[in-house]
């Protein structure tokens, strides 16, 4: 089962992601939502996600800082950085710390593909 944690400060984006992920027929299911990195870190142990969809720009901890913290506790946790602000430097840093995929927020098909691939691989 692809238990998914969504982390995004925009309520509309969390709703869109929830509908998209829960409508997938590949065993994906949203088990938690957080509005910032601090909430995600606190929530992770309660919902034990198989995969995390994480915004890059949020108040407080950035997506990369949040990913770094989550991966310190669980190095094999698949994280997808999903943002409108991904450039080569962000992508390189994400890769360096262990983020599995970086997907532009406009690329819904790419997000679904990444979630399917990462869920199948785990």
For each predicted feature, which ranges?
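Acidic catalytic/metal-coordinating carboxylates
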Residues: 36-39, 62-65
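Conserved sequence signature across two-component system core domains
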Residues: 7-8, 34, 52
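Receiver (REC) domain active-site loop signature in two-component systems and cognate sites
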Residues: 58
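Alpha4 helix (beta4-alpha4-beta5 surface) of REC/receiver domains from two-component response regulators
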Residues: 65, 85-104, 109-113
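Active-site beta3 strand of CheY-like receiver
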Residues: 47-53
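Two-component/phosphorelay signaling modules centered on CheY-like receiver
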Residues: 11-32
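Short amphipathic alpha-helix used as the core "switch/output" element in two-component signaling
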Residues: 64-75
């Amino acid at each position: 089962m692809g238990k998914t944690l969504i982390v995004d400060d925009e309520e509309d984006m969390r709703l869109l992601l929830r509908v998209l992920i829960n409508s997938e027929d590949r065993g994906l299911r949203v088990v938690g939502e957080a509005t910032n990195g601090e909430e995600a870190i606190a929530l992770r142990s309660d919902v034990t996600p198989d995969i995390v969809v994480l915004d890059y720009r949020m108040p407080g901890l950035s997506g990369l800082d949040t990913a770094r913290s989550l991966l310190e506790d669980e190095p094999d946790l698949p994280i997808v950085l999903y943002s409108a602000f991904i450039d080569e430097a962000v992508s390189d840093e994400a890769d360096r710390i262990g983020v599995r995929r970086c997907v532009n927020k406009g690329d819904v098909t790419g997000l679904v593909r990444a979630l399917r691939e990462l869920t199948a691989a785990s």
